[in-house]
Amino acid sequence: MLIVKKFGGTSVANKERIFNVAKRCIEDYKKGNDVVVVLSAMGKYTDELITMARDINEKPPKREMDMLFTIGEQMSVALMAMAMDSLGVPAVSLNAFQVAMHTTSAHGSARLKKIDAARIRRELDNRRIVVVTGFQGIDKYNDYTTLGRGGSDTTAVALAAALHADAWEIYTDVEGVYTADPRKVPKARKLKEITYDEMLDLATLGAGVLHNRSVEMAKKYGVPLVVRSSLNNSEGTVVKEEVTVERMLISGVALDTDAVRIAVIGLKDSPGVAFKLFDTLAKKNINVDMILQSIGRAGTKDISFTVDKNDLDDAMGVLEANQSRIGYVELHAEKNIAKLSIVGAGMMSNPGVAAKMFESLYNEGVNINMIATSEIRVTVLINEKDGVHAMNAVHDAFNLAD
């Protein structure tokens, strides 16, 4: 059996935790399994690298940031291989170059294109545990790239797919996927299982346990996925195509405080305007989420949308540079907002779900600024100061603690 295991930064934050991870991996190895381990940088090391970089340059080039970031994961995998060796088990650490993890050239948000698994297979054939850097790749120029937030999750599922792994396990500082972030909602309950589609929406909308791109890939390649704690032996949560128990009306509530709203005011009310606006952003690799179009002054319209706060400067810059092409009058950015979402496949066959969510927010005096929906989710834009309170109110309204 071939198992791919991914451990986040908190799981390898210090010597004790590194050895804890090493021992867990060795348990599976000694059962005769082939084991591939994907690691993030230790603890808050990536944040420390960002601070160091900005002490030198307030707006460092993205290519150089990628060069810097790769240090963190390389440190983690080398120390892990050393720990396993000290416990009497052969292990080898490999980085993106050695694995030939090819990506696009979008520094800071590259996408995986191809993985050459030959080197990993050779090491597994020699009965070694293979420890691979997450989060990083190489582009066609042989420059380092990074995969953006949640990149180590994406690395792990891509390796699982390339190696035709029998199982993919992701270890975090929580015991699985919960109905809400247990650090913000004390009544949150761990789910035994959840569908790919539900997990994808929760990941996209702010649930930090998994990254949306990794869930997309897991679904695409049918990779079995288990989310569990690195600190104990609890069963965790299974993410798969269909759940075996009766579908819940709502599977979870997510809160995203990393969004900002951009309002483009005074657009001409004519064909092609929306295309020009969002094409301009797409060419800068800026993802747009919630979109609202409203009637403006005579003969004009306004469009508001949300982007990740890390993309705000790039978004405002490219829109200002293309004002004459797009044809708007004013541009505004609003910070201190939050996206609150409910997700659940059960809402497809149950009317009144959105109304129940809106009622719970009304009862708590929370104002809704924007609304977006799909078959299995409802998202509202609210003030950030109301976020955690509103999240708990909605969680209670749908009895998710039961």
Language model segments and positions:
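Short phosphate-binding/catalytic loops that engage adenosine nucleotides
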Residues: 33, 89, 223, 286, ...
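Surface-exposed amphipathic alpha-helical tracts and adjacent flexible/coil segments at the periphery
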Residues: 210, 221, 232-237, 312
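A conserved regulatory-domain signal marking ACT and ACT-like small-molecule sensing domains
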Residues: 238-402
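Terminal amphipathic helices with adjacent charged low-complexity linkers/tails
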Residues: 39-46, 227-244, 299-300, 305
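Short hydrophobic alpha-helical runs that function as membrane-insertion/retention elements
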Residues: 167-171, 225-227, 289, 370
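Nucleotide/pyrophosphate-binding catalytic subdomain
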Residues: 1-215, 306, 382-383
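Acidic-aromatic/histidine active-site loop/patch
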Residues: 218
